[in-house]
Amino acid sequence: MLFTIFKRYVSAYPVGLILVLVFTLAQVMGSLLLPALNARVIDDGIAQGNLPLVWQLGGVMLIVAVAQLATAIIEVAAGSYVSMAVARDIRRDFFAKVMTFGHQEAQTFGVSSLITRSTNDVRQVQQFLTMAMTMMVMAPVMAFGGLIMAFAQDLILSWVIVVTVVILAIVMALAVRGMVPSFQVMQQRIDAMGSVLSQQLAGTRVIRAFGKEDVEKKRFAQANRDMTRASLMVGRYFVALYPTVFALINVGTVAVVWFGARGVEAGTSQVGTVVAFIQYLMLIMMGVLMFAFMSMMVPRAEVAAGRLVAVMDTRVHLDRDSGRVDELPQPGTFEFRDVTFTYPGAEEPVVQDVSFSAEVGSTVAVIGATGSGKTTLAKLLVRLLEPTSGTVLLGGVPIQDISRQTLGTQFGYVAQNPYVFGATVAQNLRLGNPGASDEELWEVLRTAQAEDFVRELDGQLDFEINQGGKNLSGGQRQRIAIAMALARRAPVLVFDDSFSALDTATDLRLRQALSNVSATSLIITQRISSARTADIIVVLDHGRVVGQGTHDDLMATSPVYREIAESQATQEAL
């Protein structure tokens, strides 16, 4: 999957890649040249008393060091730009893909997992790219170049380096082999803890209402312990690895000094050669360490990249960009024509052979017991779901043939559990109509029966609503959501059980105000009081239409409708 990320995103920045590769190579070549120059300074300059040569070689070493600094700055800048640009592009495409998800795809991954993927996984890939672009060139050139230069300095001493490198490579291979599954487990534990925390934050009120704080504390503590154990599992490898690696480096250095000193004493080696050898040993070890570090990062980055690609390559069942129709011949009308819908994996359809229609300016109410398929019809109309069979028409056109841009202007939709954004009242209301004036906002608030409480808020239209409307009551949140839908000035309004948190008096005033709105309305409800004034009432029972007509007609002809009315036992319903 890392190759997929590289192919899609990194390859889009060839100039940055070339700069990183060229200047990293130049930096490593400078590192390989300095020990050889240092050896000449010691053996041919200081040992021979040749001060002009010392000054000459010292000047060359200074130039090389300055050049290394310059190349390192350019390399780091180019590498950082490429990695950050790639991370930006991944986040952009990830978000764009998630925005195309329907109900099925969103449930497949889960909200907490999608958040973790868009943050932690992108960060893992970015960190890997930052390191990899440098280390992929630096590690092999430094290791093999160091070996070649060491062999060129003293063939006899080179066996010390070879033995040390072989032992170090074996240690690293064993460590990486153990770390790969540990990183995978740790990523799973991160997801699990994020899921637990997300559920607890979202369900704080329910947890408190049921007095389950201690239970949830234990559940989070268990997830935290699992995460800690997974982290400690990885940490143990690092704890054992680093002392072992540095011990090997120190032993190799001591061996070079020991055998080098004996060579100097015997006249087969020179002091400068031994010093250069130690420096080359360090460079070789650095190269091996970089390679090992990369090997440890690859599994974690591979897991992260795979999780990102899994989201971005998901085939969306509902293609919202398939439509091409921009003009509707009968705007403000809709029709369900023999519509059946079955959720993936379900044995029975949730709605079956549903047919009804709405004319311009009319109000259609859909009523039925819990689980009868009412919300599914609302989602089918606004195309959050696609019918398994049958056709949903909007403005006389099959809804799948309407372009996404046009479809987005046709509805004011209030979901069953309305969501209010963390922004001011005005910003929420202008979400679907950015050009709406303050007077227009007060007008829709008045219609939604929200004007009185908004005027009492600190700042009124500028009052800051918490994310999800947590600082509003359920009824206030519903009325703000209704006002948001009205502010769109859309030809069709869809209210999915949107009056459930309102008292009977407010519900009545709201319905009276909505009757003056120039729009076709679909009202999903369980209340007879919310449905009785509709032009057409559609009665659903187990996903099928079992009655259709006005309130009086259904009271006379529909046993299901009459049973609902009688069970609510209100004077208005009867």
Give the residues covered by each predicted segment.
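Hydrophobic alpha-helical transmembrane bundles that constitute the permease/transmembrane domains
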Residues: 25-33, 65-73, 125-128, 132-144, ...
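Membrane-integrated ABC transporters
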Residues: 1-34, 46-60, 75-79, 83, ...
